[in-house]
């Protein structure tokens, strides 16, 4: 059995935002095609403002900066990006 891939999306999910819905759909479509178990979780930007970010972000195999700003916390978004850059973490920004 394949190891589960865990992707954290840094952003504030809005179910009515087409790009947010499409991001989830694209990830799950790719995982299905590749037969890779996938866990996707949106990481709200306010949760990444403080020291908790250093505990939250390493749990994920890769990070995506969500499309569709503005973010509830620009500081939280920047902390997520900074974590990926300084830890050489897999990261996609849109």
PLM region spans:
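N-terminal beta1-alpha1 cap of cysteine-dependent amidohydrolase-like domains
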Residues: 1-94
């Amino acid at each position: 059995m394949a190891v589960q891939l865990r992707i954290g999306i840094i952003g504030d999910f809005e179910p009515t935002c087409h790009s947010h819905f499409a991001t989830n759909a694209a990830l799950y479509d790719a995982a299905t095609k590749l037969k890779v178990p996938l866990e996707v979780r949106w990481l709200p930007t306010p949760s990444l403002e403080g020291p908790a970010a250093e505990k939250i972000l390493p749990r994920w195999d890769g990070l995506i900066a969500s499309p569709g700003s503005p973010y509830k916390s620009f500081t939280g978004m920047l902390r997520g990006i900074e974590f990926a850059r300084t830890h050489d973490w897999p990261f996609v920004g849109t």
